[in-house]
Amino acid sequence: MSKLTNVVIFIVFFLGMMAKETQGQHICHQILLNNNCDGATCTSLCDKQLQGTGQCYKTVDKRFICLCNYLCRT
């Protein structure tokens, strides 16, 4: 019984620490290239400008845009 109690307390403590680390981290999005997106260029540009990850996406009107996802700065 004592071991089970210790394990439960450890798990609750661990989950509390994980929640504290992720709290307040919001993902922001920004379009960097509005047309003719190239995968390598998009990734590189997003990394250099915003320290994020960029991917090309096809829009409804069939354009390819570079969407950069990065941690918001406060």
UniProtKB/Swiss-Prot annotation:
Keyword Ligase: no
Family: Belongs to the DEFL family.
Name this protein carries in UniProt: Putative defensin-like protein 128
GO cellular component, one term: extracellular region
Organism (species): Arabidopsis thaliana
Classification via Pfam families: SLR1-BP
Any one biological process term the GO annotation gives: defense response to fungus
Annotated keywords: Antimicrobial, Disulfide bond, Fungicide, Plant defense, Secreted, Signal
Gene that produces this protein: LCR8
Source taxonomy: Eukaryota, Viridiplantae, Streptophyta, Embryophyta, Tracheophyta
